[in-house]
Curated annotation (Swiss-Prot):
It is found in: Golgi apparatus membrane. The gene is tmem167a. This is Protein kish-A. It comes from Xenopus tropicalis (Western clawed frog). It is a single-pass type I membrane protein. Residues 1-26 form the signal peptide. It comes from the Eukaryota.
Length: 72
């Protein structure tokens, strides 16, 4: 089933996108900083969410991991 139609899969994709963008921005800041607008600006925004809300994102990742491992 597609991640669009399954809510849990959609949340997983969004969490992975946020974590990946924050990690890439930490490694190569210029890669995401030059594209702050447009369709590629989504990745910059995800990186900012990952940096600023990192404790909440980490808790969401742990909760999602436990729900995948033990509730499915």
């Amino acid at each position: 089933m597609s991640a669009i139609f399954n809510f849990q899969s959609l949340l997983i994709v969004i969490l992975l996108l946020i974590c990946t963008c924050a990690y890439l921005r930490a490694l190569v800041p210029n890669l995401l900083d030059k594209n702050k607008t447009g369709i590629l600006g989504i990745f910059w925004k995800c990186a900012r969410i990952g940096e600023r809300k990192s404790p909440y994102v980490a808790v969401c990742c742990v909760v999602m991991a436990f729900s995948i491992l033990f509730m499915q």
